[in-house]
Amino acid sequence: MVDKRESYTKEDLEASGRGELFGAGGPPLPAGNMLMMDRVVKMTEDGGTYGKGYVEAELDINPDLWFFGCHFIGDPVMPGCLGLDAMWQLVGFYLGWLGGEGKGRALGVGEVKFTGQVLPDAKKVTYRINFKRIIMRKLIMGVADGEVLVDGKVIYTATDLKVGLFKDTNAF
């Protein structure tokens, strides 16, 4: 049985990384430093821009986050690829929330634009994912548009984020 709530805590997301949230076959989130969110604040199956699902999640920012110490020394900024990865993570999390099974893999993105940055003095990053297409057959895949906001301002946009779930990733 899938744990299908509208919101999830950091502890819930960490449980997902251990394979405990969506069952043994469900897609886990990354663990440790690669988990790029502190909570999911909203999930709907029929919401969003396209009426096919919506996810909103948040990451609290503080100057002690691991990436600020190495990217870059003297010019700390959150790597843009981590924001992109967070959006892919949320697409896979949503597929698990719908009952999909398998290991999540990012399959691509149409276009990404960076128009701002996350600096150590920011307070919060918000991720918004609007699903365009969900396939739940032999192929399990989500296609979505996403945006990353820092303290309420949109700084990244991505179109056609694609994530698939695979039972066997050896040939991937």
Curated annotation (Swiss-Prot):
The pathway that the record names for this protein is: Lipid metabolism; fatty acid biosynthesis
Q: EC?
A: 4.2.1.59, 5.3.3.14
| Entry-linked Pfam families | FabA
Give the positions the UniProt entry annotates as the active site. Answer: H71
Instruction: Mention one GO molecular function.
Output: trans-2-decenoyl-acyl-carrier-protein isomerase activity
Can you state which reaction this protein catalyses?
a (3R)-hydroxyacyl-[ACP] = a (2E)-enoyl-[ACP] + H2O; (3R)-hydroxydecanoyl-[ACP] = (2E)-decenoyl-[ACP] + H2O; (2E)-decenoyl-[ACP] = (3Z)-decenoyl-[ACP]
| UniProt keyword annotations, A-Z | Cytoplasm, Fatty acid biosynthesis, Fatty acid metabolism, Isomerase, Lipid biosynthesis, Lipid metabolism, Lyase
Gene Ontology BP term (one): unsaturated fatty acid biosynthetic process
What's one GO-annotated cellular component? cytoplasm
SUPFAM superfamilies linked = Thioesterase/thiol ester dehydrase-isomerase (SSF54637)
Please give the InterPro entries that the UniProt record associates with this protein: FabA, FabA_FabZ, HotDog_dom_sf
List localization entries: Cytoplasm
State the protein's purpose.
Answer: Necessary for the introduction of cis unsaturation into fatty acids. Catalyzes the dehydration of (3R)-3-hydroxydecanoyl-ACP to E-(2)-decenoyl-ACP and then its isomerization to Z-(3)-decenoyl-ACP. Can catalyze the dehydratase reaction for beta-hydroxyacyl-ACPs with saturated chain lengths up to 16:0, being most active on intermediate chain length.
Its assembly, as annotated, is:
Homodimer.
Give the family, as the similarity comment puts it.
Belongs to the thioester dehydratase family. FabA subfamily.
Q: What is this protein called?
A: 3-hydroxydecanoyl-[acyl-carrier-protein] dehydratase
**Gene responsible for this protein:** fabA
